[in-house]
Amino acid sequence: MNQDKVFENSLEKIIPDNIEIELKTPNSTVAISEQYQNNIDTQKIWQIEIPKINLVAPIAEGTSANIMNEYVGHFAETPKNKGNIGLAAHNRGYKINYFRDLKLLQKGDLIIYTYNGEISKYSVNELGIIKDTDWSKLESSSQDKLTLITCLEDEPEYRRYIQAVKL
């Protein structure tokens, strides 16, 4: 079976029959029809955007190595749309390091969080370093906020955190 056919078969598993696509080669960009682009289910988009560091990243449930090798991970113990939403990602040493520039954020910087079609804006209000055993920044809260956590370079027992409050 040639490479184009293998690629085409794998697409059949993720693109419904009623969607028109143009397939050139497995190494080219697949041109998806305008009909498909207009029908993308915005209810399923889950992402974080941080304009200051040019970050737009998908989010997935969990913080396992497998999840964080492809996504920003969501701490399952935290809510997804209200209260204190906890997210984690790598900042170096992996194929995908979404939080590599998190250290550049400052108070007042904008973070845009999209979940279930709802877009929420947050403003950074707290930045700091915590022990890797300190989970207090992820505690439940009646205030809507995002907590971003990543490793601290060359200090494996510490974590960098950013908290942002909903605007």
Regions found by a protein language model. Give the residues of each.
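Solvent-exposed, non-transmembrane regions of membrane-associated and secreted proteins
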Residues: 1-167
